[in-house]
Amino acid sequence: MRKVAFVTGGSSGIGRCTAIALRQAGCVVYEFSRRDNPIEGVYHIGVDVTDEAAVHAVVSRITQDCGVSILVNCAGNGISGAVEFTELHDAKAQFEVNFFGMVNMSKAVLPYMRKQGAGRIINISSVAAVAHIPFQTYYSASKAAIESYTCCLANEVKPFGISVTCVQPGDIRTCFTEARRKSIVGDDVYEGRISRSVEGMEKDERNGMSPDEAGKYIAKIALKPHVKPIYTLGFGYKCLSLLCKLLPCRLRNWIVGLLYAR
């Protein structure tokens, strides 16, 4: 029987490429996003993942018809700017999409996965979860929250045959860069450090890995028989993630500051 996969944020970027890779691997794929950007052979579900009631309604309808084997939580966005000048509603909106959107989808599929005694949930984090990027504070914090959530949930649902894992991409060439909500309010007070930091990040992203490669990697993990709690995408970022874990916090933060807070 073909596996049924749900992919959020499937209209563009990593989510779209993951949906395509899972379809090519033989899965029945449903992509969940607000915007319809048709993919041949993939079913589009128009929903906002931050709308808990809508998410539960549509997941209930689909799972009753065909079940669910895999959930990939790719939906996300980014904001940048100095914490001092970031409006609280913008910070909360960042968490609503990146973190609570993932929570809504996970909670919706868990009862069905538990009853069938199997399932795989993949949450997309970021290397920014371990290399905490200044002037991307709320983005980094939301991704760190995803990793904590993933590890906790993995232990909670393991007895039911459900595995939960997290993928840390580094810089990826997608429309995420252009879609980021940038604010340079206070750049004069911070002596140009906000704009320099964001420009540096965006340069790295434009020179990053292709989303096709990222999507194939995520699809491969989705179909593995067993998974680790966290995967890092790309050799260089695997080394960076390992260094962040091994280096003393003070030294690690000093190095990140040299790169992104000067």
List each model region and its residues.
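Substrate-binding pocket helix/loop in short-chain dehydrogenase/reductase
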Residues: 82-83, 90-92
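SDR active-site lid
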Residues: 159-228
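N-terminal Rossmann NAD(P)H-binding glycine-rich loop of SDR-like oxidoreductase domains
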Residues: 11, 19
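Residue(s) in the substrate-gating loop at a strand-loop-helix junction
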Residues: 126
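Active-site helix of classical SDR
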Residues: 106, 142-145
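Rossmann-fold cofactor-recognition segment
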Residues: 41-53
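Conserved glycine-rich Rossmann-like NAD(P)H-binding loop of the short-chain dehydrogenase/reductase
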Residues: 24-40
